[in-house]
Amino acid sequence: MKLTLVQIFFMMLLLLLGLGVGLGVGLQMAAAVLEESDQLLDEFLSSDSQDKAEATKEGLASRSTETLLVSNKEVVQPEDTIISEDEVGGDRMLRAEVLLHSNKDYLRSDVMDRECNALMALKVKSKDHTCIPQYIFIHEELDAVKAVCKSPAVACDLKGGKCHKSPRPFDLTFCKLSKSGQVIPHCNYVTFILEKYILMSCSDMKVQITS
């Protein structure tokens, strides 16, 4: 059977039409797959953004918890509270101690290192097992504290004794018992971080905070 040119041309046309239809269907399927991929990508990005937002909220909540923990330990910054002279010893002579640290330790500004419950735990308590009501820690170089004793003597609340005033405000941690009548080992202190002038009795190392 011989094919004429017209028949061959008609068969070629049918073949091309078949290829065109197949290619069109293939393109439609590819477009559908791409559209579905875009939707999945959008959903993933949206979920990732939501997870980051939730993580940020959790981080803020954790930071707030840390702040509350510091507050529960009763660490009080001087700029956050108004402290009267009575609260920081008034005209009383209080026992004091110069904390000897290396230069690196002295320059550290971590408030928790100056929390009174930790500092006072190392102190010798009263013989009758009552907690020491008030105590002062001086965060200055020992030479600076010794130099106070070379200044002119001034009047202070110490019978028969002499006191000397610091030439500048000293960095102090004042520890005050939160409630009177507490006994060992249940001593709970409030922490005051101050910069104040001091009157010091060099004979027995007692300090009075002054302005």
UniProtKB/Swiss-Prot annotation:
Q: Name one GO biological process term.
A: heterotypic cell-cell adhesion
| Post-translational modification comment from the UniProt entry | The N-terminus is blocked. Glycosylated.
Top-level division of the source organism's lineage = Eukaryota
Q: Name one GO cellular component term.
A: extracellular region
SUPFAM superfamilies (UniProt xref): RNase A-like
| SMART domains in the record | RNAse_Pc (SM00092)
Q: Which UniProt keywords apply?
A: Cell adhesion, Fertilization, Glycoprotein, Secreted, Signal
Q: Which residues form the signal peptide?
A: 1-24
A Pfam family for this UniProt protein? RnaseA
* Location relative to the cell: Secreted
| UniProt cross-references to CDD domains, sorted A to Z | RNase_A
GO terms assigned for molecular function: nucleic acid binding
Homology family? Belongs to the pancreatic ribonuclease family.
The protein's job, in short, is:
Secreted proximal epididymal protein required for post-testicular sperm maturation and male fertility. May be involved in sperm adhesion to the egg zona pellucida. Does not have ribonuclease activity.
What's the protein called, per UniProt?
A: Inactive ribonuclease-like protein 10
The record's gene field reads RNASE10
